[in-house]
């Protein structure tokens, strides 16, 4: 709701530079939206209003979508680090909110990450799960082994991106004065554990 007061509103008033990066699942990211990240208190944003996979189309501050080539979590962190480095150069405290698109169906992964999960149990190949197709956007049934392999590959890429963020915070001497808060909004579908 546009009338909500966010942490970004409060920290901006306290002198923080506030940025949002990744999945903005609160409303549209276009400039005219009353709930885009800027309207909700962020000075800068590089965001998409839904999940994203490879080559994500991000809007920079409400502009037309621009495709950032590569794996979505890596592109999200690259933009986040640019923002943090700029805040460091300005000697300004910052709030960098990162909402990854991963892990999220229909799932996809980089070949190097998929290869890590080539040896999942064969019995998973006999079971199927229903999820959205990357090709058609429609619901389809796929082997659980294939789906888990892609899901785990997305988690691996996201983990690598978080590691890149942590490493860069240390290199910038910001680690000791920065709070990292991680939570997720995409639990496993119930059929995975059965």
Can you say where each PLM-predicted feature lies in the sequence?
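Conserved dinucleotide-binding and phosphotransfer motif residues
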Residues: 13-14
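Residue-level detector of anion-binding/catalytic polar loops
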Residues: 17
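Metal-dependent catalytic neighborhoods of phosphoester/phosphodiester hydrolases
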Residues: 30-34
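His/Cys-centered metal/cofactor-coordination and adjacent catalytic loops
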Residues: 1-8, 26-28
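Active-site-proximal cap/lid insertion segments
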Residues: 35-36, 45-194
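Extracellular polysaccharide-degrading/modifying enzymes targeting complex plant/algal/animal polysaccharides
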Residues: 20
């Amino acid at each position: 709701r546009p009338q909500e007061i966010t942490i970004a509103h409060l920290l901006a008033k306290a002198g923080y530079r506030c940025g949002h990066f990744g999945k903005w699942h609160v409303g549209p990211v276009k400039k005219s939206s009353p709930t885009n990240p800027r309207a909700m208190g962020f000075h800068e944003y590089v965001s998409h209003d839904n999940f994203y996979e490879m080559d994500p189309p991000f809007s920079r501050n409400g502009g037309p979508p621009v495709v950032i080539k590569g794996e979505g979590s890596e592109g999200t962190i690259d933009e986040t680090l640019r923002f943090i480095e700029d805040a460091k150069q300005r000697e300004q405290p910052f709030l960098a909110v990162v909402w990854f698109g991963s892990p999220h169906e229909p799932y996809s992964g980089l070949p190097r990450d998929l290869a890590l999960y080539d040896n999942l149990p064969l019995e998973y190949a006999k079971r199927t799960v229903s999820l959205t197709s990357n090709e058609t956007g429609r619901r389809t049934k796929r082997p659980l082994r294939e789906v888990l392999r892609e899901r785990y590959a997305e988690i691996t890429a996201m983990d690598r991106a978080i590691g890149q963020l942590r490493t860069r915070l240390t290199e910038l001497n910001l680690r000791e004065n920065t709070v990292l808060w991680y939570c997720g909004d995409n639990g496993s579908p119930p059929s995975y554990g059965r």
